[in-house]
């Protein structure tokens, strides 16, 4: 069934709004994936704060025009699933990378982050970005280790000072 012009404009506007509020985007080929698997992917995406939509290529190109994800337009060939991360930059990449491991027919085409295109082979860089909570925990660990090291150096200096006095 062909889409009416109003429907196409609504799809472009919806995807464009998602793109404007997103931190990163991932494009994938979902050809050959069962409806049940796609439903599961959409459920996981909602839980992870990821907007997922299968869009016609021409509509997807128009939707990302003028956004940081315009570099993805070259990947819009064949059936295209586009996922936008709203809460964490690596969420969509991590979600689709894990889904591709489960589904042999699912293929990630590429990603975009801060206006830069990331090829499918390098998607791990984006997927391995720590979440806000993980980054905060790493920072706290670093600060904690630094203060422990400072305490040890202070004790060593105090010991050296006492040895010199004796």
From Swiss-Prot:
InterPro entries: Ribosomal_uL10 (IPR001790), Ribosomal_uL10-like_sf (IPR043141), Ribosomal_uL10_bac (IPR022973), Ribosomal_uL10_bac_type (IPR047865), Ribosomal_uL10_CS_bac (IPR002363). The keyword Methyltransferase does not apply. One of its GO terms (cellular component) is cytosolic large ribosomal subunit. The keyword Transport does not apply. GO terms for biological process: translation. GO terms for molecular function: large ribosomal subunit rRNA binding; structural constituent of ribosome. It holds the Pfam family Ribosomal_L10. Keywords: Ribonucleoprotein, Ribosomal protein, RNA-binding, rRNA-binding. Belongs to the universal ribosomal protein uL10 family. PANTHER family: 39S RIBOSOMAL PROTEIN L10, MITOCHONDRIAL. Forms part of the ribosomal stalk, playing a central role in the interaction of the ribosome with GTP-bound translation factors. NCBIfam families: PRK00099.1-1. Part of the ribosomal stalk of the 50S ribosomal subunit. The N-terminus interacts with L11 and the large rRNA to form the base of the stalk. The C-terminus forms an elongated spine to which L12 dimers bind in a sequential fashion forming a multimeric L10(L12)X complex. This is Large ribosomal subunit protein uL10.
